[in-house]
Design a protein with these regions (language model features):
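Membrane-interface amphipathic segments in extracytoplasmic regions
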Residues: 12-404
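N-terminal amphipathic/basic-hydrophobic helices that include classical n-h-c signal peptides
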Residues: 1-13
Length: 404
């Protein structure tokens, strides 16, 4: 049976080799190594959370890492921009996310790809606020937090039609076996193509993701909320926006005609959602034309002075060193008890915590040794004996504790 499985893997790999040039295969190997560099002990299970931004994916990534970091390697990616950020060749070989997914499958890995659907208006709002500082206003979050809310709403409405509403599951995965209707009983879709398992979730079911993923992945998954905009420096402005915003009538009509909303929400869910915005509807708004939007984006990108790519914004970045694993166990225990997770597992911080614990233990031990030596010296003095030789504390070697 094992021989048969190895033969299948070999066939996958040979077929993959025949698909690309030798130069591209080398580039794939290099890029894949960089993508997995957070995991010093690669396992045979890899999950690509490959979806649009602002759909709840950061929560999903951190939850899987926190629950099963040693069983699953998790790669979070929205598009090929990440490849250029971590590769010296700026993706000159035109490697796509699909290439990396199929490459890992050709290596014999169990590969999962996850996408998430989020209700359209909320997704557009979150996407806008994700780049409101670095792109749209090119100002610090602290200063933007003081902006007049009408100014921010006007900018958002001008951009509304152009803010993404893409569906990776249908548009990017190349699946030909997508069901005609969403599985409203199971609350997810699971399709397989080229040996890769593709999963579609809904953000509205986030409270059920733990059970859903436990069933699909075959290991317990606990969901922890991560990277919520209303807890960022822009929290005041964001919450004010959510409480103030009323959707223009022409925008709401476009949402009513949204095919993704009609597919991922059943009739009752869709009606409830639309009614929630119908009560907050205003007159039509004339947004930017396509030409105006193109000019706007060109100008914003030329003026941009901040880096949009974010680092270490997850609760768990997936490092498997002893220090990070120890911190992970503590946070997972909190999550299982239903406690809110407010800390992050960042390697340098986890290492410092371990060092702090060891230093405290060393200080306590040294104090005890000093006290024992003091008592011995007092006893020897009473008995007129020569002083005992001091005891030296051998400090712990941190190389045995963490991977630096």
């Amino acid at each position: 049976m094992l021989h048969f499985a190895n033969s299948i893997i070999t066939l996958y790999y040979m077929e993959f080799l025949n698909t690309f040039s030798p130069e591209k295969i080398v580039a794939l190997e290099e890029l894949n190594s960089k993508l997995l560099n957070k995991n010093p002990s690669p396992n045979n299970n890899i999950i690509f959370v490959y979806c649009p931004p602002k759909v709840g994916s950061t929560t999903l990534v951190s939850s899987i890492r926190l629950s099963a970091a040693r069983k699953f390697t998790v790669i979070h990616i929205h598009d090929e921009t990440l490849f250029s950020a971590i590769s010296n060749n700026e993706n000159m070989n035109k490697i796509s996310v699909d290439d990396i997914i199929l490459y890992n499958k050709s290596l014999g890995k169990n590969v999962y790809v996850i996408d998430i659907f989020r209700s359209p208006i909320e997704r557009k709002i979150s996407e806008f606020f994700e780049q409101v500082s670095a792109l749209h206003f090119n100002n610090s979050e602290k200063n933007i937090n003081l902006y007049n809310i009408d100014k921010v709403i006007c900018r958002f409405n001008n951009l509304f039609p152009f803010l993404s509403n893409s569906d990776y599951f249908k548009e990017r995965y190349g699946l030909s076996n997508i069901p005609e209707t969403f599985n409203f009983e199971k609350k997810y879709l699971l399709c397989e193509n080229n040996g890769v398992k593709y999963i579609k979730l809904r953000l509205k079911d986030a409270h059920l993701w733990g059970n859903i993923l436990t069933e699909i992945l075959g290991t317990p998954i606990t969901i922890v909320n991560d990277y919520e905009t209303d807890k960022k420096p822009l929290a005041d402005l964001f919450n004010n926006f959510k409480n103030t915003y009323k959707v223009p009538d022409n925008f709401l009509e476009s949402v009513k005609n949204c095919s993704s909303l009609a597919y991922y929400y059943n009739d009752v869910e869709r009606e409830e959602y639309l009614n929630s915005w119908e009560s907050k509807k205003i007159d039509i708004f004339n947004s930017y034309t396509h030409e105006e939007y193109v000019f706007y984006m060109k100008l914003c990108l030329e003026n941009q002075s901040q880096n949009i790519i974010q680092v270490e914004h997850y609760i768990d970045i997936g490092c498997l060193c002893v220090a990070c694993s120890t911190k992970r166990s503590k946070l997972l225990s909190k999550a299982l008890r239903g406690e809110k997770i407010t800390e992050k597992i960042i390697h340098s911080g986890a290492v410092n915590e371990i060092k702090h614990i060891i230093d405290n233990k060393n200080r306590i031990m040294q104090a005890r040794v000093n006290r024992i030596n003091e008592l011995i010296q007092q006893r020897n003095a009473r008995l007129n004996r020569p002083p005992a030789s001091g005891t030296r504390l051998v400090k712990n070697n941190m190389k045995n504790i963490v991977i630096k």
